[in-house]
Amino acid sequence: MTKRRVVVGMSGGVDSSVTAWLLKEQGYDVVGLFMKNWEDDDDGEYCSTRQDWIDVVSVADLIGIDVEAVNFAAEYKDRVFAEFLREYSAGRTPNPDVLCNAEIKFKAFLDHAMSLDAEMIATGHYARVRERDGRFELLKAFDHTKDQSYFLHRLNQAQLSKTMFPLGEIPKTKVREIAAQIGLPNAKKKDSTGICFIGERPFRDFLNRYLPTKPGPMKTPDGKVIGEHIGLAFYTFGQRKGIGLGGSKDGSGEPWFVAAKDIASNTLYVVQGHDHPWLLSRQLVAGNVSWVAGEPPADGFSCGAKTRYRQADAACSFGRPALGRADGERFSLTFDDAQWAVTPGQSAVLYDGEICLGGGIIEFAATGQPGQTAPAAAAGHAGALAEAR
């Protein structure tokens, strides 16, 4: 009997290595595929691509599977990195890992795998896929502390129908145990952290290679200038470190946080205190939406939402602003409790219990007490939010 072929995305890490081993043990015809998504010729100090490939080959030899490398660097720069720079240039804080999953790991990679006569692809992500009544649902992982459905929320029915997440039912501690028991050479390798193409280098240094500095005033909510920023692109909402005000004696003496950006005047607004009103939001508008089921929830639907990775689901209600658009490009969320540092450019991802429904890119979040709203890069969407209320 012909074995079903599964192409596994292998990164050189423990998770994808155990994924490949598990599928081989289950009787699949497993082929490993190593994706090179970044040209790192000048980045040897920070990028680990060469060592990662060595680890992949070592693991493949141990478990007895074929492996190949494919270069998606051109696709990555065109579909992911270019958008990353555009968003930062506009004063927002994007999440390239979300776009990478949708455009590279589950599009370019999936297409390549199908050219190898694969029936399915698999990755080491911590999430689950469930088929019910001919439709595919994206579920949180059994190990909620490692759940990665937030990064996968833009996957569609066609992609999920061809995808396996073997680690979705396994706690991370068990994955490490398996790696050690079968003698994987990378069993003790540290998990990768941060944005894949930046590695361990200082983020500001990396960004400055592509975006110029553009100094401007740093102001308090009452308009007082208390410093100078190096460029709005280099700061994000809720940021505390690296704003140059650690020793300031002004105000209450509490820590300073980035609270807003005014693109028109190139002004960075900072506030004192973690719970300052300008850092708290109960409503947001998100655009560039994507729904796992292909359609949005009903207006007024009660759900949970994350506005950043690892955040606990926050209770909220879903709305569809009347923006004169028939394609459902935007939605609003009204939270039961105020959310901290909701950041334009990040993803707002919706959940119905364990089920990930999809989400969109945050464009605007209403902040402040009545009559006090912080300037924002997406201030043009304030009217849309008013319609959503």
From Swiss-Prot:
Catalytic residues in the record = 100 (nucleophile), 196 (cysteine persulfide intermediate)
Region described as Interaction with target base in tRNA: spans on this chain: 95-97
Q: Which cysteines are cross-linked by disulfides?
A: 100-196
Q: Which GO terms describe its molecular function?
A: ATP binding; tRNA binding; tRNA-uridine 2-sulfurtransferase activity
One GO CC term, this protein: cytoplasm
Site positions (Interaction with tRNA): 125, 346
Residue ranges spanning the membrane: these are none
Q: Identify the stretch(es) annotated as Interaction with tRNA.
A: 146-148, 308-309
Q: Which reaction equations make up its catalytic activity?
A: S-sulfanyl-L-cysteinyl-[protein] + uridine(34) in tRNA + AH2 + ATP = 2-thiouridine(34) in tRNA + L-cysteinyl-[protein] + A + AMP + diphosphate + H(+)
Q: Which Pfam families match?
A: tRNA_Me_trans, tRNA_Me_trans_C, tRNA_Me_trans_M
Into which EC class is this enzyme placed? transferase
Location(s), subcellular: Cytoplasm
Is Kinase found in the keyword set?
A: no
Give the UniProt keywords, A-Z: ATP-binding, Cytoplasm, Disulfide bond, Nucleotide-binding, RNA-binding, Transferase, tRNA processing, tRNA-binding
The UniProt entry lists the main location of this chain as: cytoplasm
List the EC numbers from the record: 2.8.1.13
**Binding residues for ATP:** 9-16, 35, 124
Quick one: a GO biological-process term for this protein?
Answer: tRNA wobble position uridine thiolation
Cross-referenced NCBIfam families, in alphabetical order?
PRK00143.1, trmU
Q: Which family does it belong to?
A: Belongs to the MnmA/TRMU family.
> Can you say what this protein is called?
tRNA-specific 2-thiouridylase MnmA
